[in-house]
Design a protein with these regions (language model features):
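Active-site and adjacent substrate-binding regions of carbohydrate-active enzymes
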Residues: 1-259
């Protein structure tokens, strides 16, 4: 209700805002210390995602994202270990690129870049990361435990150099980068994905093309949002409708196939 007063297309203060209620489900408020963690399920993600979009309806407008410079990489953040692959990455892409709102693609997300678990705190630059590490130590966690929390949550996970190709420093620079390049760059890089019709990058291009240059473009851009199959576990599903057309989006949040 309060948010709507800010984002209403009729009399709100802003024409668009980012809504992050579903971005840190694993951390307990109000402090959101990295060591103060809680279990979450796809049902929690679905609840937060649906409540925001149902509240906004056709009266407000969101900037929609699953990654930014202050969050871990989405594949590692939202998916179980066994789901961190092509299918999981493209499912997450479809989930948010087809929502009502303006989708934002953060650098590297379109090729499925991953968290970079540095082995030493000396490799991390982010001041918040060092603050959280020191707080964990002060509250009784071992250096190994505190480092593991950093590897999961550090903002530097999303700030490593973009992985252009498999040459030195992932083709980003011939100098010394501000952060170490993720060592997976030899297998995961833009040049390789450009050559692969079944890559994560190719899927992003398809979804963006569907949104911008297809018979569904107007529906995806302007259509209404409504949850679907809300009671189904491990499934995030919604319908978009516009002028007699309907689009059903089904996102399977479990590694196993379902019917």
């Amino acid at each position: 209700e309060t948010l709507l007063s800010f984002i209403s297309l009729e009399d709100g203060v802003f024409s668009m805002v980012f809504e992050f209620s579903w971005c840190q489900l694993e951390l307990k408020g109000p402090n959101y210390f990295w060591y103060d963690r809680q279990e979450w399920t796809p049902e929690d993600l679905k609840r937060e995602l649906f409540s925001s979009h149902e509240m906004a309806g056709d009266r407000g407008w969101f900037g929609v994202c699953t990654e930014n410079h202050d969050q871990p990489r989405s594949i590692d953040h939202y998916l179980p270990r066994e789901g961190r692959n092509y299918y999981g990455a493209t499912m997450l892409a479809s989930m948010y690129l087809l929502l009502r709102g303006t989708p934002y693609v953060y650098q590297g997300q379109e090729i499925g870049m991953r968290n970079c678990a540095y082995a030493s705190m000396d490799d991390y630059n982010d001041v918040s990361t060092h603050n959280q590490y020191n707080r964990a130590l002060a509250d009784g966690f071992s250096p190994e435990e505190a480092l593991r929390l950093v590897q999961l949550e550090s903002r530097d996970n999303a700030r490593t150099p973009f992985q252009w190709d498999d040459t030195e420093n992932a083709g980003f620079t011939t100098g010394k980068p501000w952060l170490k390049v993720n060592p997976n760059y030899t297998e995961l890089n833009a040049a390789q994905e450009e050559r692969d019709e079944d890559s994560v990058l190719a899927w992003y291009k398809k979804m963006i093309g569907l949104r911008l240059h297809s018979q569904w473009s107007e529906l995806i851009s302007e259509g209404t949002f409504a949850p679907a199959y809300r009671e189904e576990k491990n499934l995030i599903a919604y319908r978009r409708r516009f002028e007699g057309k309907a689009l059903l989006v089904l996102c399977n949040m479990q590694p196993e196939e379902r019917e």
